[in-house]
A protein has these predicted regions:
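Compact, glycine-rich, soluble single-domain proteins
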Residues: 34-54, 58
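HotDog/MaoC-like acyl-thioester-processing domains
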Residues: 77-79, 90-133
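A generic structural signal for short beta-strands and their flanking turns/coil linkers
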Residues: 9-11, 21-23, 42, 63-69, ...
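Residue-level recognition of well-ordered beta-strand positions that form the cores
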Residues: 26-28, 70-72, 86-88, 102, ...
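Detector for glycine-centered tight turns/loop "hinges" at secondary-structure junctions
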Residues: 38, 61-62, 108
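Hydrophobic beta-strand-centered segment that forms part of the acyl-chain substrate-binding groove
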Residues: 54-84, 89
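Non-catalytic linker/capping segments at the edges of enzyme domains
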Residues: 1-26, 30-31, 129-133
Length: 133
């Protein structure tokens, strides 16, 4: 999935680790990611958390998509910092999943908390032979 994610690539995201139900993704903040107050645009932080969430929830043979998500911003960040998003599966029931993503700065201080809700489809992940659900 991440190999074809042009948006994440354009933002310079790097996958640091993947395990079943878990993913770690980082990104160096650039000047063009800052808003009018010279702090990181919230959509950039959301995109990082959303990418970690997407990787964590696509650990099976079926395409899993977001059914909803929300984010709480805790601290501002600025250009030159590296953010790291760690997504963790909290619970899965049938086709539905719930994931928490913590976004931290260079000092491992939380700067945002994201909660994602997922829904697994019948579609196989590209390049895999998915068993029936």
């Amino acid at each position: 999935m991440i190999q074809n994610d042009r948006a994440s690539a354009a933002l310079g995201m790097i996958v640091r680790g993947v395990e079943p139900g878990r993913a770690v993704v980082s990104m160096l903040l650039r000047n063009d990611m800052m808003n009018g107050f010279d702090v990181t645009h919230g959509g950039i932080v959301f995109a990082l958390a959303d990418t970690a969430f997407a990787i964590a929830c696509n650990d099976d043979h079926h395409v899993t998509l977001a059914s909803g998500a929300d984010i709480t911003f805790l601290k501002p960040t600025t250009a030159g910092q590296t953010l790291t998003a760690t997504a963790v599966l909290r619970t899965r029931s049938g086709r539905s999943g719930l994931y928490d993503v913590r976004v931290t700065n260079d000092h491992n201080v939380p700067v945002a908390e994201f909660r994602g809700r997922s829904r697994t489809t019948n579609l196989p992940l590209p390049g895999t032979a998915a068993p029936s659900l």
